[in-house]
Amino acid sequence: MSTTRRTLLKGAASSSLIAAMPSIVTAQTAATAATVAPARANVLRCVMHADLASLDPIATTASITQYHGALIYDTLFGHDSDAVVRPQMVAEHKVSADGLTYDFTLRPGLAFHDGSKVTAKDCAASVKRWGARDGAGQHLFKQVADVSANGDNSMVIKLSKPYPALLDWLGKSSPSVCYMMREKDATSDPSRPITEAIGSGPYMFNRAETRTGSQYVYDRNPNYKPRSEAASGFAGGKVARMQRIVFQNMPDEQTAISALLAGEVDFLERTSPDLRSQLAGNNRVRTEVLNKTGQIGWLRMNCLQAPFNNAKARQAMLHLIDQKAVMQATYGDPTNYRGCGSLFGCGTTMENDANTAWFKGGQNIARATALFKESGYDGRPVVIMQQTTSPVLSNASLLLAQWLRQAGVNAQLVPLDWAGIVARRANKGPVAEGGWGIFLTWASGSAYNNPITLAGHAATGDKGWFGWPEDARHEQLRDAWVQAPSVDARKKIARDLQENAWNFVPHAYLGQWFDVAAMRSDVKGLIGLADLVPFWNVSRG
């Protein structure tokens, strides 16, 4: 099979996206009413990696929705550039001597975009909603006895057992971030996306100027009071220097490159190597790797349905994938990528080589074929949801289908944009009922380092993240890891986790790559985070 290193894709917004966001073009609030358009110099136009399919950063782990959340919401805590957790909306906090009670006092002057005051009731409800949905939150809430308000400005979390990572999880920037919402939004079912977008963060969502599938507009919140500290990582003062931020949807990368060169847009989150050459030598633009930990592509299998409800079929996927071929198909230059066999990602603290003979041995179609046979595979269709809006995942899907067919599997590609995948991956049923067999996605390289905060590291069955693997030993080891007294102790448990995981196989990896962003030369102040692109602190000129 011949695969090019670039897949250019065009398309309009899907009907599933429109259905997911029914109020975007109809609902209005005082905070988002149409305003006089700011001067072009005060607007940052950004082309992101995907269209915004959902407004709810708790209901979905989609990275683009987390970016949206970072603009309009705020958090109780955040990690600075040295990975130290710092207070954000919190003025001060106290922990009882036994480690079971946490008391948080909010900063004065916090207000939502609709003018209402941020209260401890809002925060308590937000923490509960996050805890019911997020992987780290679910793990934490196994030890939470109560979360409640103690007056307007104080929130109390009571634990049944000490949990050393509580503040870290409240301040993490990996999906899903623990964003603070209004109580009336936060008390809704966390599995059903909210359609309101009213937070207390540095930018306000402008529904009047938003065009679903085309552009999403955020205006500076004139009432936001940033912290006095300098911006650092996901912490410090979130200063909205630009009057307006616009997420511009441009699926065709050549169109986006041309728009950047013409000054019609200011920032491209990702550029492919073959198109990036058009930017070389042009002093009006520059490129930068913002996420130094890279991205790791992975595939999730529907562990509730055959054939992947059998561990043998999942083991087959480890032997089936040639990570170098997947990366070569899109990135070409090997300096842009590498293979990775560690459950915890490569270049991370917890990286290890336990139980990686399958990776060191390279692709083995014959072994994969034998394992599918041992699993009892009966020839039924295995649907691969091919993400058409990502060149690397689209190319990987094509290769994966080819390799599965070589292993005797009836692989069927179903092309979908990201919004379509987000909608369909929630279906736990068989293919005949709209289900699926495999979908491909990615996460920041740093996200894999932590077996608690990455939702896909859980093995809690149908209560967990899409794919729904289940393994009791894995969950016991995750519990032990979070309670471990030192980094060295965690590293030892990480080896045990990986040894066990590559036997039951919760997912499989496609390789690790390093995205290069491009921007106009006058764009200043971008903060490089591993998990999202924040746009506070950014200016032009």
Q: Where are the language model's segments positioned?
A:
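Extracytoplasmic/peripheral linker and loop segments enriched in polar/acidic and small residues
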Residues: 37, 359-362, 412-426, 452-521, ...
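N-terminal lobe/hinge region of extracytoplasmic solute-binding protein
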Residues: 47-97, 125-128, 198, 509
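Surface-exposed binding/hinge segments that line
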Residues: 139-186, 191-211
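Structural transition elements
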Residues: 203-204, 335-374, 390-395
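Ligand/substrate-recognition segments at binding pockets and active sites
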Residues: 212-214, 252-253, 271-273, 337, ...
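Ligand-site clamp/hinge motif
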Residues: 226-278, 410
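Periplasmic-binding protein-like
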Residues: 278, 304, 308-348, 395-396, ...
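Long beta-strand-rich cores associated with HINT superfamily self-processing modules
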Residues: 519-541
